[in-house]
Design a protein with these regions (language model features):
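Glycine-rich Rossmann NAD(P)(H)-binding loop
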Residues: 102, 124-129, 156-164, 174-175, ...
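Active-site Tyr-X1-5-Lys
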Residues: 53, 65-96
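Substrate-positioning beta->alpha
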Residues: 29, 105-111, 125-147, 154, ...
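Flexible, glycine-rich beta-alpha linker
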Residues: 51-52, 90-111
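NAD(P)H-binding glycine-rich loop region in Rossmannoid oxidoreductase-like domains
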Residues: 1-25, 33, 51
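Conserved C-terminal active-site "lid" loop/helix of NAD(P)H-dependent oxidoreductases
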Residues: 136, 171, 195-236
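Conserved Rossmann-fold NAD(P)-dependent oxidoreductase catalytic core, especially the SDR/UDP-sugar
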Residues: 29-69, 93
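Mid/C-terminal beta-alpha module of Rossmann-like enzyme folds, strongest
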Residues: 146-211, 246-250, 256-267
Length: 267
């Protein structure tokens, strides 16, 4: 069995062809090796980015409408693997996770939590937009169950429920860290976008990667709420509740950090 996790997915990649070379050409290479080695089962981690800015509650049958090169190339990779699967007695399980977080994961959720912990966080927009999230411990458990399933061809979004709006998420993290809730300073959406475009201009001129960009602010303020049929995978039940997963992550990263823990940089 091949579990295909590799991808270029940062939103500040300087050469757009990096997405094509890794996500598409790299996947084609893996499929070819599977043919040569007679490997007949693959689990492919794609992304909900293939749906773009989808309607809230989008499921696995939602229209494919990626808004960036990451989503486009990941769907192209899916199509390559579907062709591979259809050419013989082969099994393909495609998993489309939403944003993943957890201990040791340096991604967008960690960046948000770090800003809150530092006291420098500024809320942008009304904060009522919902965000689907996925805890790494649950994603790993789901992929592990994919290894043993007898299904031959399936697509699953991976989402941990319930979806939280940004106000609730920020308040929950701030309460755990500081013993008080509230969301602190706030900018309007349009002012936040002005800051984002200014940051984009500076990044282009200086060649520096900045933590703020227009696309990141747009994604932060958008609703990205998805539904999932993951329970159809042999009755799968995630081992961690979302609320507990957030608490575990905040505690591990900011309250009782382990200096020897391995770190994975995904953003």
């Amino acid at each position: 069995v091949v579990v295909h996790l590799a991808a270029v997915h940062r939103d500040d990649v300087l050469d757009p062809m990096d997405y094509q070379r890794t996500n598409v050409d790299g996947t084609a290479n893996i499929a070819q090796v599977c043919v040569e080695k007679n490997i007949r089962k693959m689990i492919f981690t794609s992304t909900v980015a293939v749906y773009g800015f989808a309607e809230p509650g989008a499921d696995e049958n939602a229209p494919i409408n990626p808004f960036n090169e990451y989503g486009r190339t990941k769907f192209e990779a899916e199509e390559i693997l579907r062709s591979w699967q259809q050419q013989g007695d082969r099994s393909l399980i495609i998993v489309r996770p939403t944003v993943i977080f957890g201990e040791g994961n340096r991604g967008n959720v960690y960046n948000l939590f770090q800003q809150i912990a530092s006291g420098r966080f500024v809320m942008i927009g009304q904060g009522r937009n919902q965000k689907s999230m996925a805890y790494i411990g649950n994603v790993v458990a789901f992929l592990n169950q994919c290894l043993s399933t007898t299904q031959h061809n399936a697509v699953y979004n991976y989402v941990d429920t319930p979806d939280l709006d940004m106000n609730t998420l920020v308040q929950q993290v701030r309460l755990q860290l500081n013993g008080r809730d509230g969301d602190g300073l706030r900018l309007t959406y349009w002012l936040g976008m002005v800051v984002g475009y200014m940051a984009d201009g500076w990044a282009k001129l200086s060649g520096q990667r900045l933590p703020v960009s227009a696309i990141r602010i747009k994604k932060f303020c958008s609703t990205t709420a998805f539904s999932s049929s993951k329970s159809n995978l042999d009755g799968f039940t995630p081992p961690y509740r979302l609320e507990d997963a957030i608490k575990r992550t905040v505690d591990s990263e900011f309250i009782n950090p382990d200096p020897d823990r391995e770190i994975f940089y995904t953003e």
